[in-house]
Amino acid sequence: MTQRMKRNANMLKALHSCSKNDQKMLLKSAKPDLINAICDCLTNVVYGKIPISSQMKTKLRRKKKVLKELTDPKITTVRKKNLLVQHGGGIITNALGGIAKFLLGL
């Protein structure tokens, strides 16, 4: 787990446990460090470093194009923030569900 994810562990836990409307409000006011931490989590899930259930994989497969943009290091943080605000609900809940056990250990 990266230092960025450790610094933002409390916010990641809050994003995982709150409703979609609350997630959207938190993401709109999020700092770039939190956006990058979320993208780090997504990168770890996409590349298989963090195991997730097959049910979560099928849900994330529907958002394949958005996931590619969020995990691309060439895309700016502002663009990633806009993508997360627009498509964030399902992506964040499913991806952070996979790393919840790691976050709870912090």
Where are these regions (language model features)?
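Short, cationic, amphipathic peptide segments
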Residues: 5-8, 80-106
